[in-house]
């Protein structure tokens, strides 16, 4: 440790004043820094703990956030957790179908107003209102399952959220997919990160040479200010190859631009979980980020937003596989087809082993059960919560056998 400094959470070093002539305010600051040093982001995302998180927002600003909940306007706020208070952070509404004026879905950006400010090493934090999921567990359990299958996935935990000391109910604390996340889970985090945004149903087809079609769908999440040719040229080149490469050379031409093994693995996990709004979603591709390392043209997927999984226990593993340009051609490649079936089998065995998927549901339920019943702003009743929980547990028990049967049939060449 550097003399005259304190090592805070996530190894951030903050210079300290001289011990001579310390004021009460300085002592309070030192105490808060000590608290921060004792905590890390792993503590915040502890899946077995129900956190208490408090936001303090000017009452007039809060009223505007509720009245204009469809807008992305930032407002100043303080965030407090376990005695650590982050001042002058920025908060705004977030979400698509989950946006509502009652139980706000929120994004907190710690550096928006204060350059370089971090909370437990993080630039931002998502507060998911769990509005459309009566179980409040689909995303949390799904992200844990992605991680169990070796995929980079945002960490999640639960909290009771208070705004101006008024309980808002149960929320998920969600790690934001940003360069900090990438550096923790994939590589050095110096590459190009893009968030897919829904404009119109999109199935992976080539959108032409003009970059505007890609720019409208893939929002920049790193390297702000770099020219469009640098940001979007490689994305255009990838989709061109996907659509125009011949069948005999398709895999060899596309794989240097898109990690096809990782792509197929991602889709297989979604299909096992009966995801209705993912890569093979009902309205086209949805809920993913693209990441490209700084020294490479090869893209990969990052999973986000999994609150529509567990859709139907009998969801076919071939559901909509012929609609997506990328996956349709991947499934025609013998190596990738074999990989798809193998990952589905791996999912089924991981879900069944020691009650793996059901055990994760039990783990999440133990954290939130009582708090959900006391949630004053949730959309669904406690009976609906119980029914959704029972449905998830039935899915966890039955899904592995159904998928293993599908895989065995497909390996025999049967439809």
Enumerate the language-model features and the residues they cover.
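Bacterial N-terminal signal peptides
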Residues: 23-33
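Phosphate/dinucleotide-binding and metal-coordinating scaffold of catalytic cores
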Residues: 38-415
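Bacterial N-terminal signal peptides that target proteins for export
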Residues: 10-24
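Intrinsically disordered, low-complexity segments enriched in serine/proline and basic residues
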Residues: 1-3, 7-13
């Amino acid at each position: 440790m550097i003399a005259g400094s304190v090592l805070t959470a996530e190894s951030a070093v903050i210079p300290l004043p001289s011990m001579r002539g310390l004021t009460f305010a300085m002592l309070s600051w030192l105490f808060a820094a000590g608290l921060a040093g004792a905590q890390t982001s792993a503590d915040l995302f502890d899946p077995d703990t129900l956190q208490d998180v408090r936001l303090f927002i000017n009452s007039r600003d809060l009223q505007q956030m509720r009245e204009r909940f469809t807008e992305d306007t930032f407002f100043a706020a303080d965030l407090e957790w376990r005695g650590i208070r982050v001042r002058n952070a920025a908060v705004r509404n977030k979400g698509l179908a989950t946006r509502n004026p009652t139980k706000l879905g929120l994004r907190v950006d710690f550096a928006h107003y204060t350059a370089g400010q971090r909370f437990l090493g993080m630039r931002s934090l998502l507060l998911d209102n769990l509005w459309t999921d009566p179980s409040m567990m689909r995303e949390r359990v799904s992200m844990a399952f992605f991680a169990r299958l070796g995929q980079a996935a945002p960490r999640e935990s639960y909290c009771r959220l208070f705004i101006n000391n008024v309980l808002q109910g149960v929320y998920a604390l969600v790690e934001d997919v940003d360069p900090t996340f990438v550096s923790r889970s994939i590589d050095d985090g110096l590459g190009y990160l893009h968030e897919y945004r829904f404009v119109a149903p999109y199935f992976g087809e080539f959108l032409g040479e003009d970059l505007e079609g890609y720019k409208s769908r893939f929002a920049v999440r790193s390297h702000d200010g770099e020219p469009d040719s640098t940001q979007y040229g490689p994305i255009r080149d990838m989709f061109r190859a996907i659509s125009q490469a011949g069948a005999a050379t398709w895999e060899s031409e596309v794989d240097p631009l898109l990690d096809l093994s990782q792509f197929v693995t991602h889709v297989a996990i979604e299909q096992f979980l009966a995801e209705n709004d993912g890569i093979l979603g009902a309205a086209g591709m949805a809920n993913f980020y693209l990441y490209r390392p700084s020294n490479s043209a090869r893209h990969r997927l990052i999973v986000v937003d999994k609150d529509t999984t567990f859709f139907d226990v009998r969801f076919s593993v071939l559901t909509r596989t012929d609609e997506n340009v990328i996956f349709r051609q991947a499934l025609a490649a013998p190596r990738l087809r074999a990989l798809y079936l193998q990952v589905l089998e791996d999912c089924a065995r991981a879900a069944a082993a020691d009650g793996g998927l059901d055990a994760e549901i039990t783990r999440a339920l133990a954290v939130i059960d009582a708090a959900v019943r006391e949630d004053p702003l949730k959309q669904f009743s406690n009976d609906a919560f119980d029914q959704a929980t029972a449905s998830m547990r039935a899915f966890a028990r039955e899904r592995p056998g159904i998928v293993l049967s599908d895989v065995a049939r497909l390996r025999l060449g049967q439809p």
